[in-house]
Swiss-Prot record:
One of its GO terms (cellular component) is cytoplasm. This is Elongation factor G. It is found in: Cytoplasm. Belongs to the TRAFAC class translation factor GTPase superfamily. Classic translation factor GTPase family. EF-G/EF-2 subfamily. It comes from Nitratidesulfovibrio vulgaris (strain DSM 19637 / Miyazaki F) (Desulfovibrio vulgaris). Residues 8-283 form the tr-type G domain.
Length: 691
């Protein structure tokens, strides 16, 4: 099959931001101007095309990453609109993993907010080039340059304005393009479709010249010949500046900044021009690398070409009530077509590709073929999980998977009636497969089912989906903190598991040493020499240890951040088995942890409260009373932003308390920051409750 649009004219981008910065509205305008949507959907009407789940339309927030395709100036743009609410961080994570570029949307009044920082860090981790759009320039308190300064202070970025706003707040009427030297003003009667290009306003000329000089100096360094030309006193042409900005953006040396008001239909077409001009095509990014599943030392490069063997990543699963199981798939090399057989190299199983769909939010177009660089939805991959690699069986390769955040909050859930019992288990299993940051586990002591997630809203929406999509009714307990356990000292365990009861017995012997491994999770080192434990019994010891760590020795919470070294052991020719060594591993770790001064850990949250000045004292006093540590404060227009770190256990019900303390005028955001040791007295209470 041949492509209708060459790869160099394709863009895979994400739109990312803090909640309420205007991401979905910006995406809606993009769809309107590119001709996909004939009517502009407004988020506050509950009619936005990209927010298509019922809960999204009711709450006015984006929960899942809707994927859509549109065209602009002979380019194809695949857009993923990601949620800005911290409870849905996994959606942002999995989108950034498969994108080539991103548009970061900022609120011109609030500037860089906590979730903006989280998303920015995620984009840094995946090396995603980005451009910025300072939105809501028409709102009271909008300040473009303060927003740019905050990008330097909080994001450690190198923002370079490509536009300047003409006016602000209710006088905002357009932008000055620093490259073309034109003022662009948008026609309100045509919803911004029509716009005029004029000369730079006289009162902005000095600012224009100053900022244009800064732009040229920042990007000329990308090209030695152009730098010489510039230093020699010659003017750079528009084409030369655009070429330099593109190189610098893709190299992540600068972040071009644009501005506008998506809701007022101002500044979106120049933003689309920038996506095409400055963000990379699949050919511009570093070639994807993976490893050979049969030889982990061997790196396999997957060049972005349809002629190469297939390699792609499943980055999202979704259950469609009409079609069934959808797997969202990014192809890095090769092609995929309906009917072909692919290898899931993560599981080692083969799968048959059913139908292929190109998604437009919740509408879909059936296609027969997709090639390197494409993002499509596949029907029929029954065994696939998020993060799995699909490839050509003749060239197996495993691509790097996703970073899955650990849940910090859990609730007990039970079916309302006997009829709901089986349906509840099946529905929870389906939802856990779709969303890797959502976990389901059984509490062996109480017999309860616990569901765990990234926050109260995350779990609320899961329970809501059980009723709406699966017609399952469930009772939900009060939220509980997802505590963890760890060790503070090193220890050793010499464990023998011997069972003799007629017939074949059981024999396993392992000596392990454990030590704290702060922030690095679980690590297993096999230091066995001379075959004192045969090779085939090493993995069962490791598995036994990991399974035992799911329920800690203090209060049954998962044990984390431990390095285990298997140093010695012995076996019996007849009585040793994988099962015997599995049991030995599990007994050894419990014994070793008991000796290693175990402690309880609790999640600490980053909290930002924006409050009117007159309530500042009450807000600060309340945070201190919740064991909070204030990190910094910042004055905003008529209000103060307070940032603090507070234990999650102290934050339940905070929204209601804050509303009553400030007459509903303060707002707050909260996201997980790190785990920290629980003070001894409180730890005793938690352990007693569990005991």
């Amino acid at each position: 099959m041949s492509r209708t649009v060459p790869l160099e004219r394709q863009r895979n981008i994400g739109i990312m931001a803090h909640i309420d910065a205007g991401k979905t509205t910006t995406t809606e305008r993009i769809l309107y101007y590119t001709g996909v949507s004939h009517k502009i959907g407004e988020v506050h009407d509950g009619a936005a095309t990209m927010d298509w789940m019922e809960q999204e339309q009711e709450r006015g927030i984006t929960i899942t990453s809707a994927a859509t395709t549109c065209s602009w100036k002979d380019h194809t743009i695949n857009i993923i609109d990601t949620p800005g609410h911290v409870d849905f961080t996994i959606e942002v994570e999995r989108s950034l993993r498969v994108l080539d570029g991103a548009v970061a949307v900022f609120d011109a009044v609030a500037g860089v907010e906590p979730q903006s920082e989280t998303v920015w860090r995620q984009a840094n981790r995946y090396g995603v080039p980005r451009i910025c759009f300072v939105n809501k320039m028409d709102r009271i308190g909008a300040n473009f340059f303060r927003c740019v300064d905050m990008m330097v202070e909080r994001l450690r970025a190198k923002p370079i304005p490509i536009q300047l706003p003409i006016g602000s707040e209710d006088k905002f009427e357009g932008v000055v393009d620093l490259i073309s030297g034109k003022a662009i003003k948008f026609d309100k009667s045509s919803k911004g479709v029509e716009f005029t290009e004029e000369d730079v306003p006289a009162d902005m000329m000095d600012l224009y010249l100053e900022k244009r000089l800064a732009l040229v100096e920042a990007v000329a360094e990308e090209d030695e010949a152009l730098l010489e030309k510039y230093l020699g006193g010659e003017e750079l042409t528009e084409e030369e500046i655009i070429s330099c900005v593109r190189k610098a953006t893709i190299a992540r040396n600068i972040v071009p900044v644009f501005c506008g008001s998506a809701f007022r239909n101002m500044g979106v077409q120049p933003l689309l021009d920038a996506v095409v001009a400055f963000l990379p095509s699949p050919l511009d990014i570093e070639q994807m690398k993976g490893m050979n599943p049969d030889n982990e030392e061997e790196t396999i490069v997957c060049p972005c070409s349809d002629k190469e063997p297939l390699a792609g990543l499943v980055f999202k699963l979704f259950s469609d009530p009409y079609i069934g199981h959808l797997s969202f798939f990014r192809i890095y090399s090769g092609f995929i077509e309906s009917g072909m057989t692919v290898l899931n190299s993560t599981t080692g199983k083969k799968e048959r590709v059913g139908r292929l769909l190109r998604m437009h939010a919740n509408k879909r177009e059936e296609i027969k073929w997709a090639g390197a660089g494409d993002i499509v939805a596949v029907v029929g991959l029954k065994q696939a999980s998020t993060g799995d690699t699909m490839c050509d069986e003749k060239r197996p390769v495993v691509l790097e998977s996703l970073d899955i955040p650990e849940p910090v909050i859990e609730v007990a859930i039970e079916p309302k009636t006997k009829a709901d019992r089986d349906a509840l288990s099946a529905a929870l299993a389906k939802l856990a497969k779709e969303d890797p940051s959502f976990r389901v586990k059984g509490d062996e002591e109480t017999g309860q089912t616990l569901i765990a997630g990234m926050g109260e809203l995350h779990l609320e929406i899961i329970v809501d989906r059980l009723t709406r999509e699966f017609s399952v009714n469930a009772n939900v307990g009060k939220p509980q903190v997802a505590y963890r356990e760890t060790i503070t000292a090193s220890s050793k365990s010499d464990m023998k598991h011997v069972k003799q009861s007629g017939g074949r017995g059981q024999y396993g012997h392992a000596v392990i040493e454990i030590e704290p491994n702060p922030g690095k999770g679980y690590e297993f080192v096999n230091a066995i020499t001379g075959g004192v434990i045969p090779k085939e019994y090493i993995a069962p010891v490791d598995k036994g240890i990991q399974d035992a760590m799911k329920s800690g020795v203090l209060a049954g919470f998962p044990t984390v951040d431990i390095k285990v070294t298997l140093v010695f052991g012995s076996y019996h020719d007849v009585d040793s088995s994988e099962q015997a060594f599995y049991v030995t591993g599990s007994m050894a770790i419990k014994d070793a942890v008991h000796k290693a001064s175990p402690v309880l850990l609790e999640p600490i949250m980053d909290v930002e409260v924006v409050t009117p000045d007159e309530y500042l004292g009450d807000v600060m006093g309340d945070l201190n009373g919740r064991r909070g540590r204030v990190q910094n404060m910042e004055a905003r227009v008529g209000s103060q932003a307070v940032r603090a770190q507070v234990p999650l256990s102290e934050m339940f019900g905070y929204a209601t308390d804050l509303r009553s303390k400030t007459q509903g005028r303060a707002t707050f955001t909260m996201q997980f920051h790190h785990y920290e040791r629980v003070p001894a007295q409180l730890a005793e209470e938690v352990i007693k409750k569990k005991g």
